Amino acid sequence: MFAGLVVGAAGPAWADTPTMDGSYTETATLPSGGTLTSSWTVNSCGDGCVFIKAGAGGSQARLVDGQWVLDTLNNISCADGSYTQYGASSHMTWDPTTLTGTAQHTYIVPACGRPPGYTETDQIKIEQTPSTSATPTPTPTPTS
């Protein structure tokens, strides 16, 4: 999976690559034109690594060849209301500067009338959510 480095070899220039930290909203535009959004909480897990928590799950994204890469399992929700937990594998890649990329989903079980192996590619855009930890403004106390 990872090759070892030769002693004395220069490492990747992590300092030149934008990192992610904080709260984000990921918007996926489906091939049909519809959109889905999810909230992410992102924390660094070392050079070229971020841990992304989305909903009840979480996974590490790694910087590979100048792109963030995240491989995970996803749930499938069908138009008829049926639901398959962890029914698709997802391979997401996005540019660390523009925070745009793709998410390719491959069904690993039949769902929504589609066979295993069915793939769909969404366009994704990730935006940092403004911090809500601003200093609260005092509320005036009414006088009698």
Name the predicted role of every residue range:
Residues 1-15:
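Secretory targeting and sorting signals
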Residues 16-21, 44-48, 62-66, 91-100, ...:
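A short, structured loop/turn motif at beta-sheet edges
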Residues 16-38, 101-104:
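Tryptophan-anchored aromatic micro-motifs
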Residues 20, 38, 88, 120-122:
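Residues that flank catalytic or metal-binding motifs in active/ligand-binding sites
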Residues 30-94:
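Predominantly extracellular/secreted and cell-surface proteins with exposed
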Residues 73-75, 79-81, 100-109:
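A short, terminal or domain-edge coil/loop segment
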Residues 88-99, 104-107, 113-117:
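Low-complexity intrinsically disordered segments
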Residues 105-144:
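Edge beta-strand at a domain terminus
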